[in-house]
UniProtKB/Swiss-Prot annotation:
Belongs to the TRAFAC class translation factor GTPase superfamily. Classic translation factor GTPase family. EF-G/EF-2 subfamily. GO terms for cellular component: cytoplasm. It comes from Legionella pneumophila subsp. pneumophila (strain Philadelphia 1 / ATCC 33152 / DSM 7513). One of its GO terms (molecular function) is GTPase activity. One of its GO terms (biological process) is ribosome disassembly. The keyword Cytoplasm applies. The lineage of its organism: Bacteria, Pseudomonadati, Pseudomonadota, Gammaproteobacteria, Legionellales. Keywords: Cytoplasm, Elongation factor, GTP-binding, Nucleotide-binding, Protein biosynthesis. GTP binds at residues 15-22, 86-90, 140-143. This is Elongation factor G. It is found in: Cytoplasm. Residues 6-288 form the tr-type G domain. The keyword Nucleotide-binding applies.
């Protein structure tokens, strides 16, 4: 029996690395009856962390997808189908979070009640804002030393710029944490510890918390009153709101991203997760609550698709994974229509048809075969040949291309070589498969040295890749030292002529172009404009000029690093009836770009990282001094339960080996996180040293 769309919830669970997100997901699976025993992260048995590396490191790397059903703590709802994507919290894997949020309708963001809003959480929040994803918050670990619920609430307001609405208050904290107070029902909830919180009872609010509860309930009423004129009138008249009125108002305000409902508890101690599940149903959108999906047709005209089974089929592939048993899995979110196994779909980005063989409903790493996928579903297809992350699958007679995903360029590179001759071929296959799965991981061969270079978002990212080559593909590799992925760009506009002419008996070569080369704003990328009029260069040679320019850009002009953020206009040139060819124009374009770029004040760009260090106050001076020595710019400082938080922007080149240095400088008491921030021009002395090396 298919679940009606209004009873669907497609949600992600996202958080900082140690906020207890996977534990929260495990409890969700336990209470919804999907797993019969609770898997703990610290003993390496969590269901959603199914890769060996995840179980060893205790962190989540790939987004596992699973489906469960929930009808409320009090069994007060119809059975809702919840598709959950568990996302990684480590900064090197933010790409996984980004692509999950792109296909979700709502998110549960988990915060640690001791650490509060951490850098990773800010990144996740920004990504959720970018895709307009409504969210609810679960403040976890209320049983830990230093737990402070209200401090986290004020950080959500100040650091994340959102409007939190507190729906629960904790009863006690740290070891005294007993349960939570439901501020809408104005009742305390006590979960039964003997059956791991499967049952609970409502009891009266402790007398000493009554006035605080009334104060916070007043905030809820105030927020709800904003929903409609009717409620505002009631509010101004001082009339009571019913529970249904409050929930309806909060649901609307959450879905439109005006407020963020906040829950609290301790997943590890089996308190609070069940109420969060109720919150998912009550406040997060179903596929029918979100705006129609927008895309373009083959002519580039905007079209809308409703989330409905009657519309033509459309879906977005958001993840490719290699499964040891079934081969390539393509995870996709269906937005409209119905897809049955055996159907043929059209990949509108690549212009290729694909026949759908098996369709699978995923549960972490186990799977169940299904006959069809409907709008609103998240599922996986086996063995699709041409689909990569971000491609659209649709009905070939009703073509639509959905908005693609942007993936950041890698910032770090290492050379890898197979340990033995036998590993050589296997390594190529393994790296190809891993690059297909992960759009933020790139592989290429260095033309001069012949070495295989792998690039990624951080040291941990590449460590995991090398680890997976060994475990999943049996390839042993030696790994070089990490190298920084520099870039080059231009500071000045120039016009340049480029001519490639060869005469050597028989047919010659002739290509002649004039290019205008200009710098673009950072992040704008490469733009090629064809401004040829009157056929001075025939149409068929224009793509060759573009190709020649792009190849030269990849090889750099001053230090061999890719040139970024330039606009090139082809505005004049000439051709020869017999001697001109695509090859001649490609070479002319390439040479012309290089000659012009060298006159356009080329500079070297280096990746700058946002670094956040949490340190006891005693070591503050040492930490700051060390960051300055690393060419860091301190952006700000603030207090935290663990001492001081220092925020700085530091070039990646200066950050290798930082964790060891920080540990020894602070006797292992300071911690840090780092994520890519931007590319910036490298100082002259640094740039000269790098150019000399090449």
């Amino acid at each position: 029996m298919a679940t009606p769309l209004k009873l669907y919830r497609n949600i992600g669970i996202a958080a900082h690395v140690d906020a207890g997100k996977t534990t929260t997901t495990e409890r969700v699976l336990y209470y919804t009856g999907m797993s019969h025993k609770i898997g703990e992260v610290h003993d390496g048995a969590a269901t959603m962390d199914w890769m060996v590396q995840e179980q060893e490191r205790g962190i989540t790397i790939t987004s596992a997808a699973t489906t469960c059903y929930w009808s409320g703590m009090d069994k007060q709802f119809e059975s809702h189908r919840i598709n959950i994507i568990d996302t990684p919290g480590h900064v090197d894997f933010m790409i996984e979070v980004e692509r999950s949020l792109r296909v979700l309708d709502g998110a549960v963001v988990v915060f640690d009640s001791v650490a509060g809003v951490e850098p990773q959480s800010e990144t996740v929040w920004r990504q959720a804002n970018k895709y307009g994803v409504p969210r609810i918050v679960f403040v976890n670990k209320m049983d830990r030393m230093g737990a402070n619920f209200l401090r986290v609430v004020s950080q959500i307001k100040q650091r994340l710029g959102s409007t939190p609405v507190v729906l629960q208050l904790p009863i006690g904290a740290e070891e005294e944490f007993k349960g939570v107070i439901d501020l809408i029902k104005m009742k305390a909830i006590h979960w039964d510890e003997e059956n791991k919180g499967m049952t609970f009872k409502y009891v009266d609010i402790p007398a000493d918390l009554k006035s605080t509860c009334e104060e916070y309930r007043a905030h809820i009423i105030e927020a709800a009153a904003e929903y409609s004129e009717e409620l505002m009138e009631k509010y101004l008249e001082g009339e009571e709101f019913t529970e249904a009125e409050i929930k309806k108002a909060l649901r609307h305000l959450t879905i439109t991203n005006k407020v963020v409902p906040v829950f609290c508890g301790s997943a590890f101690k089996n308190k609070g997760v069940q109420a969060v599940l109720d919150g998912v149903i009550e406040y997060l959108p179903s596929p029918t609550d979100i705006p129609d999906i927008q895309g373009v047709d083959e002519h580039g005209d905007v079209i809308h698709r409703k989330t409905s089974y009657d519309e033509p089929f459309s879906a977005l592939a958001f993840k490719i994974a290699t499964d040891p048993f079934v081969g390539t899995l393509t995870y996709f979110r269906a937005y409209s229509g119905i897809l049955k196994s055996g159907d043929t779909v059209y990949n509108s980005v690549k212009g290729k048809k694909e026949r759908i063989g098996r369709l699978l409903q995923m549960h972490a790493n186990s799977r169940e075969e299904i006959k069809e996928v409907r709008a609103g579903d998240i599922a996986a297809a086996v063995g699709l040949k041409t689909v990569t992350t971000g491609d659209t699958l649709c009905d070939q007679d009703k073509v639509v291309i959905l908005e693609r995903m942007d993936f950041p360029d890698p910032v770090i590179a290492v050379a890898v070589e197979p340990k033995t001759k036998a590993d050589q071929e296997k390594m190529g296959i393994a790296l190809g498969k891993l690059a297909q799965e992960d759009p933020s991981f790139r592989v290429h061969t260095d033309e001069e040295s012949g070495q295989t270079i792998i690039q990624g978002m951080g040291e941990l990212h590449l460590e995991i890749i090398v680890d997976r080559m060994k475990r999943e593909f049996n390839v042993e590799a030696n790994v070089g030292k990490p190298q920084v992925a520099y870039r080059e760009t231009l500071k000045q506009a120039v016009e340049q002529e480029g001519k490639f002419v060869r005469q050597s008996g028989g047919r010659g070569q002739y290509g002649h172009v004039w290019l205008k080369i200009e710098p673009q704003e950072p992040g704008k990328g490469y733009e090629f404009i064809n401004a040829i009029v009157g056929g001075v260069i025939p149409k068929e040679y224009i793509p060759a000029v573009d190709k020649g320019i792009q190849e030269q850009m990849q090889n750099g002009v001053i230090a061999g690093y890719p040139v970024v953020d330039v606009k090139v206009t082809l505005f004049d040139g000439s051709f020869h009836e017999v001697d001109s060819s695509e090859m001649a124009f490609k070479i002319a374009g390439s040479q012309c770009f290089k000659q012009g770029a060298l006159k356009a004040k080329p500079v070297l760009l280096e990746p700058i990282m946002s670094v956040e260090v949490v340190t006891p106050e005693d070591y503050m001076g040492d930490v700051m001094g060390d960051l300055n020595r690393r060419r860091g710019l301190v952006q700000g400082m603030e207090d935290s339960p663990a001492g001081k938080i220092v925020r700085a922007e530091v070039p990646l080149a200066e950050m290798f080996g930082y964790s060891t240095d920080l540990r020894s400088a602070t006797q292992g008491r300071a911690t840090y996180t780092m994520e890519f921030c931007k590319y910036a021009e490298a100082p002259t002395n640094i740039a000269e040293a790098i150019i000399k090396k090449q």
